């Protein structure tokens, strides 16, 4: 089956955010939609094709992204955005973790954990943590490293939202902090953080459950060969690389999601 055949037969779509549907600024400012983003989400919604928007960012909650993307004219269902915290919650819950030291933001990580019935803990109030979750944390400091060391040394499991080095923005690549923080914690504990965001199998499983679609029948669209295309490879899904001139071995390579719209418009029916 060709890539085009698999695209036509796909039962669900996973759409990246930064560099795929929109571009933000390095300071986290307003998003600008990329060509085809509004049309792609509208097309999938109109045809009843299940899809989720999956960002590897953990600074903001899924609800924030729903509102922000809708404000740009994109069609996004109420529960249509996933972040690494979404898959983290699945993992933490399945493994019986309840008290989670958060190295990240209260809005992006703390609030979703609370909504899921878990208890987020922060530096200075972290006694009894049974897990540590690393996310975007630009104010990370020695007190946080001490807290992580205490928790992991006492037996807490260590997880990270992302291993991405950079995030695409309209004003240039922005450093992803999760990877650096995980490296610092490893340096003092000897423990490697387990990845729960893209491209991990945990992320694949969360998407498949949310959409009710087998992973191998998904189309995963993004601009990062190390994230979306690798995620597609692990899932056995169709990987569509957009806006990237690298040498990644993607199933389809397109200039942007507007080209994907052009391919889907005459052909895709559920």
Positions of predicted regions on the chain:
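Active-site environment of divalent metal-dependent phosphoester hydrolases
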Residues: 60
């Amino acid at each position: 089956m060709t890539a085009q055949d698999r695209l036509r037969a796909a039962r669900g779509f996973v759409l990246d955010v930064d560099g795929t549907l929109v571009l933000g600024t390095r300071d986290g400012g307003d998003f600008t939609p990329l060509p085809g983003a509004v049309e792609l989400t509208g097309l999938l919604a109109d045809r009843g094709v299940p899809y989720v928007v999956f960002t590897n960012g953990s600074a903001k909650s899924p609800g924030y992204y729903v509102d922000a993307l809708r404000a740009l004219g994109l069609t996004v269902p109420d529960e249509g955005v996933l972040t690494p915290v979404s898959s983290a919650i699945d993992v933490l819950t399945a493994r019986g973790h309840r008290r989670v030291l958060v190295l990240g933001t209260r809005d992006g990580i703390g609030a979703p954990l609370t909504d899921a019935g878990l208890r987020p803990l922060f530096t200075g109030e972290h006694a009894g943590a049974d897990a540590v979750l690393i996310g975007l944390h630009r104010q990370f400091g020695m007190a946080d490293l001490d807290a992580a060391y205490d928790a992991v040394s006492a037996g807490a499991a260590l997880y990270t939202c992302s291993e991405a080095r950079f995030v695409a923005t309209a004003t240039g690549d922005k450093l992803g902090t999760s990877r650096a923080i995980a490296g610092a914690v490893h340096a003092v504990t000897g423990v490697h953080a387990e990845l729960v965001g893209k491209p991990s199998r945990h992320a694949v499983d969360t998407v498949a459950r949310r959409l009710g679609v087998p992973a191998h029948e998904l189309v995963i669209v993004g601009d990062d060969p190390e994230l979306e295309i690798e995620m597609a490879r692990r899932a056995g899904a169709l990987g569509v690389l957009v806006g990237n001139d690298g040498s990644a071995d993607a199933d389809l390579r397109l200039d942007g999601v507007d080209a994907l719209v052009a391919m889907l418009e005459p052909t895709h029916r559920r």
